[in-house]
């Protein structure tokens, strides 16, 4: 599965290496870059597929840091933007695949099979998601339709994000907005050669402030009654580098969230027709929640 996703990730990086984006990345005043798109961009009814939107995190004129300039990214015409969007969605949702549930015998073929199962599930789930979003838009329910399952990482997002946040890491960060919950999966720092002191990276809260600011901006755009940021941090990373973050969690307005009960899931009748959900889980992560 890793090799399959890595190929998709490489394709994404190739698209992101546009002159426009590289200029923003190389500008030292930009402390973060966000690229995002609504899943409604996948609708075949669109006469022209919308381009992803680009925002930068930098020091504003008032002396504070903020996300600004939500403008379309200029993507070369030879790029299949729909394929790009699906690659991003697959990379985000694959973060929850539990490797040990993939049989070791003929693992290469099994990984391809899992990737195909996941993609098929995403396509089917996306049909349901798009129908719901269209209904909410037509009935204007989106204005105060705070979903009861927006917290559920198993639900597809209404928007997907790629973050480049050198305050934390040089790796891409995968995110999605699901109703009034912003889900952010942090990459591992344990094997990063670009971070000299992983421990101090977690202690330095500038990266967390950037994510909170981005979540707050989303809240202003969608006018939800409340907006929450959910961070998914790999357990090994947190144990080795991030315990100080846990110690100071109350000071930064965060709280620990329980992982899902897999016993309930595994005994669910829904799995009778779903051949991939049992391979997904959040138990590799420590989940932190912040209200914005």
Curated annotation (Swiss-Prot):
Coiled-coil features, chain-numbered ranges: none
GO molecular function: ornithine decarboxylase inhibitor activity
GO BP field: negative regulation of translational frameshifting; regulation of proteasomal protein catabolic process; viral translational frameshifting
Any single GO CC term annotated in Swiss-Prot or TrEMBL for this entry: cytoplasm
Subunit structure, interactors included: Interacts with ODC/SPE1 and thereby sterically blocks ODC homodimerization.
Functional description taken from the UniProt entry: Ornithine decarboxylase (ODC) antizyme protein that negatively regulates ODC activity and intracellular polyamine biosynthesis in response to increased intracellular polyamine levels. Binds to ODC/SPE1 monomers, inhibiting the assembly of the functional ODC homodimer, and targets the monomers for ubiquitin-independent proteolytic destruction by the 26S proteasome.
Family: Belongs to the ODC antizyme family.
Protein name, as recorded: Ornithine decarboxylase antizyme
Native source organism of the sequence: Saccharomyces cerevisiae (strain ATCC 204508 / S288c)
High-level lineage: Eukaryota, Fungi, Dikarya, Ascomycota, Saccharomycotina
């Amino acid at each position: 599965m890793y090799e399959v996703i890595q190929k998709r990730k490489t394709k994404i990086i190739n698209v992101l290496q546009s002159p426009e984006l590289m200029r923003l990345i190389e500008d030292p005043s930009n402390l973060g870059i966000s690229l995002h798109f609504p899943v409604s961009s996948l609708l075949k009814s669109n006469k022209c597929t919308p381009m992803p939107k680009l925002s930068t995190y930098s020091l504003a004129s008032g002396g504070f840091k903020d996300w600004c300039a939500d403008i379309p990214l200029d993507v070369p015409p030879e790029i299949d933007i729909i394929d790009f969007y699906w690659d991003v969605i697959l990379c985000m949702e694959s973060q929850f695949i539990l490797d040990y549930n993939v049989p070791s015998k003929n693992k290469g073929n099994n990984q391809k099979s899992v990737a195909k199962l996941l993609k098929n599930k995403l396509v089917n789930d996306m049909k349901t998601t798009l129908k719901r979003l269209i209904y909410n838009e037509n009935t204007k329910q989106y204005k105060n339709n705070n979903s009861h399952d927006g917290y559920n990482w198993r639900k597809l997002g209404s928007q997907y994000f790629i973050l480049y946040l050198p305050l934390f890491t040089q790796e891409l960060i995968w995110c999605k907005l699901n109703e009034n919950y912003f889900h952010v999966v942090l990459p591992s720092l344990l094997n990063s050669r670009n971070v000299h002191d992983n421990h101090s990276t977690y202690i330095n809260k500038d990266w967390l402030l950037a994510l909170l600011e981005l979540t707050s901006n989303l809240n202003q755009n969608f006018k939800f009654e409340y907006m929450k940021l959910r961070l998914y941090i790999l357990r090994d990373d947190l144990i080795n580098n991030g315990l100080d973050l846990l110690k100071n969690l109350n000071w930064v307005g965060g709280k620990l969230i329980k992982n899902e009960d897999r016993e309930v899931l595994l005994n669910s009748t829904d799995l009778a027709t779903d051949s991939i959900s049992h391979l997904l889980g959040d138990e590799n992560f420590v989940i932190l929640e912040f209200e914005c």
